[in-house]
């Protein structure tokens, strides 16, 4: 499983406990739930190791300030980061529209910074100094997605929030921790004031990290296969009770997405009214 609970509720602590207790002996999924000891978690960044892009393809003084690659999603969860993404977009659109671009699905065209889909995410990213990389959710241990790594491989410096224990995976000197800012405006000012020398130091740190043998081993497909082989056990045979529990979880997942769709309509209407 590679999605957090805000996308697939079955991956929540509640869902994991039911799966571990009633459906499987051991499941290789995506989290570190202490209360569900039969659950093992591993999310490798997609496509790792990817070839490092030419980090000097676009000179510093020709790069725009920042970009974001994200879909316009909504979720009914106190840990979701979709709302914070929209706050950042609004802030950057208001204060530096000429230096920020947004790419992704389902954004309203009334946003002046919206550029639609990027044909090549990595080549597009090279045109920017920073990439805003907020995950779908926070406070879900081990839920490390591809956004942070995509930015680093493209040669940009990521502004990241997601996994609370991120420095267990990636050194602090390789990214800008969005949690240090009290508001999107404070983050914007920090990025605008960074010197070329400071920026290049981040990029040197990134190259050193992603080029290391330890990183390649930990986040490669081979590394994932090894983790699965070490953790996985044979599943129990299905019984009628287990099938009923699984169907209940699938129904829970379906109802959650209907609620999210309703929330999306309400929030989109609010966005349109504000811009009007």
Residue ranges and their predicted role:
Residues 10-102, 106, 110-276:
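Pol beta-like nucleotidyltransferase catalytic core
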Residues 1-5:
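Active-site proximal beta-strand in glycosyltransferases
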């Amino acid at each position: 499983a590679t999605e957090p609970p805000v996308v697939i509720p079955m991956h929540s602590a509640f869902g994991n406990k039911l799966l571990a207790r009633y459906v499987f002996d051991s499941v290789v999924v995506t989290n570190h739930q202490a209360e569900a000891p039969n659950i093992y978690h591993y999310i490798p960044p997609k496509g790792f190791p990817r070839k490092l892009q030419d980090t000097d393809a676009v000179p510093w003084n020709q790069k725009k300030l920042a970009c974001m690659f994200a879909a316009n999603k909504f979720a009914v969860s106190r840990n979701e980061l979709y709302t914070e993404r929209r706050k950042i977009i609004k802030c950057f659109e208001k204060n530096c529209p000429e230096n920020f671009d947004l790419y992704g699905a389902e954004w309203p065209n009334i946003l002046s910074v919206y550029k639609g889909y990027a044909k090549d995410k990595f080549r597009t990213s090279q045109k920017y100094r920073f990439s805003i990389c907020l995950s779908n959710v926070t406070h879900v241990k081990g839920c490390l997605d591809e956004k942070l790594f995509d930015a680093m491989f493209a040669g940009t410096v990521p502004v990241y929030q997601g996994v609370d224990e991120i420095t267990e995976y990636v050194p602090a000197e390789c990214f800008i921790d969005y949690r240090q800012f009290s508001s999107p405006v404070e983050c914007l000012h920090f990025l605008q004031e960074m010197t070329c020398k400071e920026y290049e130091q981040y990029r040197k740190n990134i190259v050193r990290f992603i080029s290391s043998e330890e990183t390649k081993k930990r986040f490669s497909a081979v590394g994932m296969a090894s983790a699965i082989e070490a953790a996985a056990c044979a599943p129990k045979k299905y019984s009628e009770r287990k099938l009923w529990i699984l169907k209940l979880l699938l129904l829970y997942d379906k109802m959650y997405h209907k609620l999210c769709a309703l929330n999306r309509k309400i929030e989109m209407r609010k966005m349109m009214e504000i811009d009007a």
